[in-house]
C-alpha cells in the first residue's frame, strides 16, 4: 500500500506541475488534488507513526507557529521573494545532493544539519509561494485560474516544514 500511495503522489504531482490543462480545469484539478492529498496523508501517517505522540504534537505546534509567522511576514514584507525562484531551485538541488551523501554517513549530527537545512529552505519556499499566490506588486505571480496549484504549493511547503521539524525533534531525542 505504501508503494501505491507513493506512486499516486508522484504521478499526480508531476501531472499537475507539467500539464497546464490538469491544474487549470475543473473538475480535473480537484480530482488530482484529492488524489494527491489522500496519498500524501497516508504516507504522512506512516511516517509520523515512527515517532512518539508527544514529538508529533510538538512538531505540529512548531510548524503551525512557524507557518503563521512566515505567512504574516510574506504579507507584510517589502522584500520581493518571487524573484528567488532560481536560487531556491539550486538550493533544493544542493539539499538533495547533501541528502544523498548523508545516506552514506549516517549519524545524529548530519541528520540534524540536513533537516535544519530542509526546514530553512522550505520556510523560504513558503514565503516565496505565498507571495506568488498574492500577486500584487511582486514581480512574478500565479494566475488566478491556477488556485489549486497554488494551494498544492503551500500544502507541500507546510508538509515539508513539518517533516523536517519532526526529523529534528526525533534526531534530538536519540
Predicted segments, located by residue:
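A hydrophobic alpha-helical transmembrane-helix feature that marks the membrane cores
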Residues: 1-174
Amino acid at each position: 500500500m505504501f508503494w501505491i500511495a507513493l506512486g499516486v503522489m508522484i504521478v499526480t504531482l508531476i501531472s499537475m506541475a507539467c500539464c497546464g490543462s490538469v491544474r487549470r480545469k475543473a473538475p480535473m484539478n480537484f480530482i488530482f488534488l484529492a488524489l494527491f492529498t489522500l496519498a500524501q496523508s497516508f504516507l504522512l501517517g506512516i511516517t509520523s507513526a515512527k515517532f512518539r505522540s508527544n514529538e508529533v504534537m510538538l512538531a505540529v505546534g512548531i510548524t503551525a507557529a512557524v507557518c503563521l509567522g512566515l505567512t504574516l511576514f510574506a504579507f507584510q514584507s517589502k522584500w520581493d521573494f518571487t524573484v528567488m525562484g532560481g536560487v531556491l531551485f539550486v538550493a533544493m538541488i544542493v539539499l538533495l545532493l547533501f541528502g544523498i551523501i548523508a545516506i552514506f554517513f549516517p549519524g545524529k549530527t548530519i541528520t540534524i544539519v540536513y533537516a535544519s537545512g530542509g526546514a530553512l529552505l522550505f520556510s523560504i519556499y513558503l514565503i516565496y509561494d505565498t507571495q506568488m499566490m498574492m500577486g500584487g506588486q511582486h514581480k512574478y505571480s500565479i494566475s488566478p485560474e491556477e488556485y489549486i496549484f497554488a494551494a498544492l504549493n503551500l500544502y507541500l511547503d507546510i508538509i515539508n516544514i513539518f517533516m523536517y521539524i519532526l526529523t529534528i525533534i526525533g534526531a534530538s531525542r536519540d
